[in-house]
């Protein structure tokens, strides 16, 4: 997927930039939140080709690169999924401990209903990257995103499916 190539290169550049900006501080905290985690499109138990595996791999790699440059970085991932079957696969994968150097959690439910819990999880000190890639047509509008958009030290990558936008 093109979006995964974009996500990987963007996330790596962003995390390394934010991490290096914190050099000299006791610790850099970088959070990644996948608001529509899935997994989708992968039957592989390692979830290869999903944003889940990609984000964990990228954050683990960035943590190692930052450590080699003298930056102590805490990497955290949060995955939100409302589909019960997909959430079960996600939860099982995360419990296996792949990329253990990255802290990870998953919340079952719709990200809209969980916005305040997501913000509590993010805290106020760390930098947070939100990946918003809805499965199918989901009206992701400013009013829905407002609580997240108002959080300081945050960045967003929102995937819009052209065909859905073109139909409106």
Model features per residue range: what roles?
Residues 37, 134-135:
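Conserved Walker B
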